[in-house]
Amino acid sequence: RPGVVSRGYGRKSKQPSSVDAASNPDDGGDEPVLIAKRTQVPIRVDVDRRRAARYLIAQGCNVIVSDDGLQHRALPRTLEIEVFDSQRGYGNGRLLPAGPLREPLRPADVRVGNGLPGDQDQAFAMHLQMTQCYHLNSGELKALDAFRGKTVQAVAGIGNPQRFFNALAEHGLTVQEH
């Protein structure tokens, strides 16, 4: 039974808490709530990932996924899976502020390249495909194609938002980026 541990970046509370699909992002963090809605697995947010993992294990989880956890070396691991943006790669290979890396590259057991051609030797390929929009107030899902030809206000709070904006444009939306 899998469980997810996360720091819960952006949440207002700093107390450890469990997150589910009904959780408020202010309490659990944006990403943990989205993960909960998508997976329905137990999620624990805590600045101390070891404590969060112990909590989930006590709840019956036998596989722990640490969201954005490669830099948290205090959490023991059996397998490291690194997901990277194949368009940007590792940039110049340097650490911030001279480059894009938050920490030195370390060996990973599995590398997965988002947008990577499938013929690469050192990594698996994956491709994200946007198909639906989620209405933040009502929770309603709509096919992205329902907005073809319309002008949309697109807001992104991610490190490389251009891929998101480009994907919307590829679906025929006129995008005003924010």
Predicted features by range, described:
Residues 1-7:
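Walker A/P-loop phosphate-binding motif and the immediately C-terminal alpha-helix
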Residues 90-178:
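C-terminal accessory "lid"/substrate-recognition subdomains
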